[in-house]
């Protein structure tokens, strides 16, 4: 039979088990408000029974506290991370689209926008000149309204550039945050393994790691996996340590056990710009070990994807075409040195590439992908040619940079391959709205100036342009020579170089009034014939018709004055979608977090009940000790020998 002191050992184990449960409850209560803390519980099991060689076989030996485990459901963690990733993406989009709405807003009293300014120019100002074309005051006022229109677009371009800079800076901030979190998780992995190799559970460290994963999932989409490390000499024996891996961006490893990979932001140089309207210094992201990090991967997710799509979104209107020819061209640089460069001609079929007014290719050079090879290019030219049947064909010829930028020569095997510049991003981000403004100012200025050029001013001289564009450096203005007007071409072939004096050089940022017109309002053409008197204003009627007839000057199927309506519809739709998805995913993430908190969170009422339960258990174990004390007293002191 078991020893008479066997019961004392059972009571002792009961005291230990109840004490462990009480201490765990104390810890839970203390951390009820601690962010990321998971409720813990003492896992107990019956001690191995002892064989006593009696009819009842075995005698129970009490209870053992096996471990203190955290209560956590990884299924809800993963669901939360997925929802949090979408929440992060639309959080960024709704923030920036709200700004965009504010910029395009038109409030005639507090914040005059396009419609107010355009109506003053096209209705009030134009009507005054039509009524009194000989008056210098009315013409000066009209030119002033035109200048207000150019100032509006200058300001809008500046606002969008600021937005692009903010998004770019925030991308860098998020990359630094990823690096910080990944380094901390790698350190935690090491600390967790050090503790768990001894057989204990690193509950608090695991909670800290999960909290960091919550933060990381908002920045980018993540996947995790954890599996035990086994003894190399005995694969069936687990060492107690685990290998924890985090992957982002379509499966690229960010953290592997104790090691973390770091990302770096590299500013694009002037010759690496993608869009004509891009600000300098936009960041590309790479791994510090030299491997590529695709910032445009659709699986990127989170705040990063929202920021990238806002910064670079072009509504899938990037440059693309098919290589039709390669060649050579002699190019003379700024120092007068002539050198032969490779060229590649790319035929385009998309409507937005056929019209140079819609083109957003960088005028500082860039990178072009030909098949699976990437080349730097210095310049490009646009060609429109008509065949014998009068059918037009459109192509772009790129002058490839020399060996200082390219580590390979262009070969003829690229012919027939796909060519592209930049990425096609399925979102209407800042480049899209910049391109929309550029298209409008180019098309409107072109039509407006054409009418003025066909008439005569107060001096009887041929009409001048009203709208111009400033050079970036020397303070001069573009003249927009008709020799580069491909839209007036009916046959043959015309080539427009990116440096030529074409309307492609005009952007919302450099849009301006002809300086000479500001100095002398009488240069404004108002009549169709030089012999007509100063009161003649028939030319201005053509301008009025042009601004109100979408067949004479159309923008996306609307009249010139409906520009804001077209663009604002895009902004409103994107802002509405962003707000809707932001609220939806915020609610979904909150709902999932509530579900997982119901499992892993601390409930004060439940812990209060546990306190009473474990206290009773402790009291009963103490009662066992007291009872056994009385038994031993009778057995040892009062039993006669």
Residue ranges and their predicted role:
Residues 1-641:
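Structural signature of extracellular appendage/secretion-system components
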